[in-house]
């Protein structure tokens, strides 16, 4: 697939980081030569200096042969014009634009986005999506990620198994899932180091530090977590590092959360701090050096339940999380923009990594993948994806059993939603019209699974 990306800042770079893992021909256009040089050192891309909204530039990069344009510069107008040019002059079939300004996002103006006005197939707001992902962790304290499916009726969530004294540690996953069935839940996958275990074997037992993925009706999430020794202790005290769109959206939502007692934002840039403070009511915004003992004390860092580092600097985010991890009761969360810091981040105790590329790409997966996808999430770089597949009466899959699908060995149908019933880790089930399938797809199997569930 030929993909043209407009913008080489953090959002554009994060997209390249994920898309470069596939068999894609990627062109990156930006006016900043230094940013292009930086991204070209790390990834196999074609860097082009110029404005993505310029017709001459689009022609020079072969836009006529492009399968997709993703315009993610920091200028909304440039992104929208780029999509218009790509459609009108070059007939690009799929066009995605980053839009941050609220006036462009107002539902009243949704009719702007069509072929007769602004031909944009999908509008994305990466920073807001990151903030929403972070807020999802507040709904299920102790989790590493929460992925909502079926219009919010089902969650697939992950957590690290730290407690080895629970009864479940003595039993096979087959036995555990028989118990979880009482809550209409199931363990659907385990990540052990870099090895993924799909739950289709009888003799699999939990080990300490396994990352466990559970599918569960939303209302039973907390009860299931408790069975694995994870107590539901709300994040009452929050400290966020970095004044930006992510921290603003998070803080504004947390101000209305009855479980939150205090929220502080620390920002080293005085102007940014003042600007953020003007738009918040209950949040304490503190300007000063983020590593300063006095600033950390003013923010209540030592007693925080959760520390969220979302600055634009990966090193700062990791240092903050390293400090937070010294307090065993503080959950550390760090935003990572570059893959080179992932390994370091995983070695920080109590640290949850938020990979910008993974969150950003999740928002556009249903446009990237050639399958009938309602919802899709990337789990991490080279960790695969989870798709919600919808099956209509014209689907060739209707009437087949799960075995008949001949799923690749490293991918699996995790769950089926039929009527009001959840069926987990199915094998002999016969697919019916209007069933919804939750499918794990390994990175190497994406094309094969696309063929199985082709639109």
Task: Give the ranges of each region predicted by the language model.
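Cytosolic regulatory regions of ion transport systems
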Residues: 1-455
């Amino acid at each position: 697939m030929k993909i043209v990306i407009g913008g080489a800042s953090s959002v554009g770079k994060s997209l390249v980081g994920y898309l470069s893992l596939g068999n894609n021909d990627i062109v990156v256009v930006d006016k900043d030569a230094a940013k292009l040089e930086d991204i070209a050192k790390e990834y196999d891309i074609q860097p082009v200096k110029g404005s993505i909204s310029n017709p001459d530039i689009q022609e020079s990069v072969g836009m006529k042969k492009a399968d997709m344009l993703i315009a993610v510069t920091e200028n909304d107008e440039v992104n929208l014009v780029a999509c218009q040019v790509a459609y009108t002059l070059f007939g690009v079939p799929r066009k995605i634009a980053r839009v941050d300004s609220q006036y462009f996002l107002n539902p009243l103006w949704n009719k702007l986005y069509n072929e007769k006005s602004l031909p944009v197939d999908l509008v994305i707001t990466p920073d807001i999506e990151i903030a929403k992902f972070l807020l999802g962790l507040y709904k299920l304290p102790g989790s590493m990620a929460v992925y909502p499916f079926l219009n919010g009726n089902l969650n697939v969530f992950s957590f690290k198994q730290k407690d080895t004294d629970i009864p479940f540690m003595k039993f096979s996953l087959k036995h555990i899932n028989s118990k979880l069935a009482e809550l209409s839940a199931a363990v659907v996958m385990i990540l052990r180091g870099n090895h993924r275990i799909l739950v289709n074997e009888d003799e699999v037992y939990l080990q300490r530090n396994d990352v466990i993925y559970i599918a569960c009706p939303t209302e039973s999430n907390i009860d299931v977590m408790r069975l694995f020794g994870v107590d539901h202790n709300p994040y009452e005290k929050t400290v966020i590092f970095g004044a930006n769109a992510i921290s603003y959206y998070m803080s504004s939502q947390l101000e209305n959360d009855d479980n939150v007692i205090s929220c502080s934002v620390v920002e080293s840039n005085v102007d940014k701090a003042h600007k953020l403070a003007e738009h918040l009511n209950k949040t304490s915004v503190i300007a000063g050096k983020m590593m300063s003992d006095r600033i950390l004390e003013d923010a209540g860092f030592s007693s925080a339940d959760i520390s969220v580092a979302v600055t634009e600097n990966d090193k700062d985010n990791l240092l903050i999380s390293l400090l937070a991890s010294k307090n065993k009761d503080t959950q550390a969360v760090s935003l990572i923009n570059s893959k080179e810091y992932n390994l370091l981040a995983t070695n920080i105790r109590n640290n949850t990594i938020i990979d910008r590329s993974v969150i950003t790409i999740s928002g556009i997966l249903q446009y990237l993948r050639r399958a009938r996808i309602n919802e899709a999430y990337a789990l991490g770089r080279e960790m695969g994806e989870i798709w919600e597949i919808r099956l209509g009466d014209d689907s060739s899959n209707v009437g087949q059993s799960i075995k008949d699908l001949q799923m690749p060995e490293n991918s699996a149908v995790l769950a089926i939603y039929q009527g009001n019933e959840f069926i987990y880790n199915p094998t002999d089930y016969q697919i019916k019209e209007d069933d919804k399938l939750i499918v794990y797809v390994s990175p190497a199997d994406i094309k094969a699974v696309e063929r199985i569930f082709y639109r």
